[in-house]
Amino acid sequence: MNMEFRKKEYKPFDIFDSEWAAITVGNREKFNACLVSWGSLGNIWGAPGKSKATVTLYIHPSRYTAEFIDDSEYFTVSFFDPKYKKALAYLGSHSGRNENKIENAGLTAIPIGKTMGFKEAKQTFLCKKLCKQ
């Protein structure tokens, strides 16, 4: 994440609880996305004013997206207006192993940095993987 992240106001305890989000991982040729509702914003590793801004997500290892996380250095976390809840519900209930669920959900994938995101997102965090367990 860049320093622009620090210039905006967020409700770190509410953002994942009250808004719907999707993680997108991969590159233009092969990528996947899934609905995420467990996560947090925070900071780690650094002196005051120099810590790293972080997004922490919890993805079940059986999810197809988890395979992409293993092989990727970057990912995006995108937040959407409520009008996209039906599309996001589709992402959360269908597997990208079996279909192009992003297209079938009516969303538009776009390149963001070294990974992918969504044109329809109202806010997207471009993230670098720090740790995966």
Residue ranges and their predicted role:
Residues M1-Q133:
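Active-site-proximal mixed secondary-structure blocks
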